[in-house]
Amino acid sequence: MAEWTLGAVLDAIADAVPDRVMTVSGERRSTYAQTAERTRRVANFLAHNGFGVHTERAELQNWECGQDVVALIMHNDLYPDMVLACLKARVVPVNVNYHYTPREVGELLEYLSPRGVIYHRALGAKFADVLPGGAQLLISVDDGSDLPELPGA
């Protein structure tokens, strides 16, 4: 492999030590193999929905982005999985600090114009009113809360 990506590194580690624990959150433990599989499935889902690179780097100015942007509003161990999944799909993951006020998140999302938003279900209600209407994909990640998904997720 001429160039290594973070996704390729994860997959190589998963091949070498599939049952080694990668993340721990409360009682939940995820192995490298589980994480590699989860990130592959999410990356494929994003790609299947048309997310990825639309203009290659060589055709862009330094300040331009030729990839779709996905905002991540998350708070636990599945956050790195979603970052890696976005990178595998060649999508730009952008962290949105869930400690921000809804107004601050709204301003950030307006600036970013993300094509998709991945959020933990417990955070959905807090930011429902400021999520971008132009987002074509809204993914709710189960975080053990009893809250319902937002409409369209």
Residue spans of the language-model regions?
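Structural motif
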Residues: 73-75, 98, 119-123, 141-143
